[in-house]
Swiss-Prot record:
This is tRNA modification GTPase MnmE. It is found in: Cytoplasm. InterPro entries: G_TrmE, GTP-bd, GTP-bd_TrmE_N, GTPase_MnmE, MnmE_dom2, MnmE_helical, P-loop_NTPase, Small_GTP-bd. The gene is mnmE. NCBIfam families: mnmE_trmE_thdF, small_GTP. Residues 222-384 form the TrmE-type G domain. (6S)-5-formyl-5,6,7,8-tetrahydrofolate binds at R27, E90, K129, K464. Its cofactor is K(+).
Length: 464
């Protein structure tokens, strides 16, 4: 067990990156944080008597060496009206790396300890300032990788997820109450009214939340997009076009890329993990063979493959074999490149006649960018997240912990419905309802062990 649950300690941490910058924020919290900090603040008398939610100007003092360390602005908060629910100090100082070290060292000498990662947010949760779902949303916001994931992560801050789960819990509590009354009075001819329709609605809501995580995960972790094809087909030119900068070497000599090159780009708020692979051909040596084997492995694992074909040349053997093996593969987009040159009609006709889904065939030029907009649109329609309707106002699950608990709750609801259908004893129904309520309570934080909280909050960034 870490120091996270030692709430009597006065803690301090840098809340901004440890880099040279115009300003930095050093935050602290604890019952004695204000009097302890006042010992190293020039305007200490005003600080000790000041009300909460006030701002104070002064200097950080090194009393041992009788000198000023920095000119600062101090934000003072008094319990319970603070993020942590405790007395808190936030120091806005100049963003000097040396200055930051000196100020934090003075905090530590004054009786503070360094905060654990996520400790400020944990104290906020324990003080019932925020629900656990909102605490996890803060973590996802901080580490969002794209505009889309950031916008989706903001949604849980409204408390909609908590309200949604609370409604399901209330439905199950009604079952518990009715069963408890029945078992207490043991009236043989009394029938309990089970809210079957409400349980079905709860099942549908849980399934919707589970599906929302699958969409969020794809958006957050990124879509794997692999560029494949024979040598000198234009894969590296297409790779550089996606990135809008040169990363792959573009050359008229075939086989310039012998190993894969990886980069990321964003399209409509979705992160793409892009791979430029070695050209498919009969390998001349061990190094080339390894590169081609890796290319084949990436193609199998990809969410989407763009197979680039040089439509200005005769079709190489490797293209014949690949097209024949993958002509019905829905995750492969065949791109005929170099249409700015003289088109080889036999190559074009063979590809068109072989690929079963004509909409998965695009003609482009990476040189003059003809057909590129069509390619972008096609990529977006081929990615499965486009087929799932998810809006910024929808309730989104962005935590794997929440997802695991929701799947457990969903399985329990299915079991409950099955038992209702089989007309099992009421006490068995009550047990299942109780299990589901506890499961949902773990998501919101109403039911949580110290070990679970410790493991969750230690993954937060320092100062949060």
């Amino acid at each position: 067990m870490s120091n996270l649950f030692q709430r009597d300690d006065d803690i301090v941490a840098l809340a901004t990156p440890f880099l040279s910058s115009a300003l930095c924020v050093i935050r602290s919290s604890g019952a004695s944080s204000i009097p302890k900090f006042s010992k190293i603040f020039s305007n200490h008398s005003a600080l000790n008597s000041a009300p909460g939610n006030t701002i104070h100007y002064g200097y950080i003092l090194d009393n041992e060496n009788n000198c000023k360390v920095d000119e600062v602005v101090v934000c003072l908060y008094r319990a319970p009206k603070s993020f942590t629910g405790q007395d808190s100090i936030e120091v806005i100082a100049h963003g000097s790396v040396i200055g930051i070290k000196k100020i934090i060292d003075l905090f530590l000498k004054s009786g503070f300890r360094m905060a654990e990662p996520g400790e400020f947010t944990l104290r906020s949760f324990l003080a019932k300032k925020i629900a656990l779902t909102k605490a996890e949303a803060l973590h996802e916001i901080i580490f969002a990788t794209t505009n889309k994931t950031y916008s989706l992560a903001v949604t849980p801050l409204s408390g909609a997820l908590f309200a949604n789960l609370d409604a399901i819990q209330r439905c199950l509590l009604n079952i518990l109450s009715a069963v408890s009354a029945y078992l207490d009075y043991e009236v043989d001819d009394h029938e309990i009214s089970i809210p079957f329709d409400l349980i079905l609605n709860s099942k549908a809501e849980l399934k919707k939340l589970i599906n929302s995580y699958k969409v969020y995960e794809k958006i957050d972790h990124g879509v794997t997009l692999v560029l494949a094809g024979s040598v000198n087909a234009g894969k590296s030119s297409l790779f550089n076009m996606f990135l809008k900068k040169d990363r792959s070497i573009v050359s008229s000599y075939p086989g310039t890329t012998r190993d894969y090159i990886e980069a990321t780009f964003e399209l409509d708020g979705i992160l793409f993990n892009l791979f430029d692979t070695a050209g498919l051909k009969d390998a001349d040596n061990f190094v080339e063979r390894l590169g081609i084997e890796k290319s084949n492995s990436l193609i199998k694992e990809a969410s989407l493959v763009i197979y680039v074909i040089d439509v200005s040349s005769n079709l190489p053997r490797e293209d014949f074999l690949f097209i024949d093996s993958n002509k019905s593969n829905s995750k492969i987009l065949f791109v005929l490149n170099k249409i700015d040159l003289n088109i080889n009609k036999s190559t074009e006709e063979f590809v068109r006649s072989s690929v079963l889904n004509s909409s998965n065939l695009i003609m482009i030029s990476t040189k003059n960018l003809e057909g590129i907009d069509i390619l972008y649109d096609k990529i977006k329609t081929l990615i499965s997240y486009e087929r799932v309707e998810i809006g910024l106002d929808d309730i989104i699950i962005s935590s794997s912990r929440q997802m695991q608990l929701l799947e457990k709750a969903y399985a329990l609801v299915l079991d409950l419905l099955n038992k209702i259908d089989r007309q099992v004893s009421y006490d068995m129904l009550a047990f299942d309802a109780y299990e589901i309520i506890n499961c949902l309570g773990e998501i919101t934080g109403e039911v949580s062990s110290e070990d679970v909280l410790d493991n969750m909050f230690k993954n937060f960034c320092l100062g949060k």
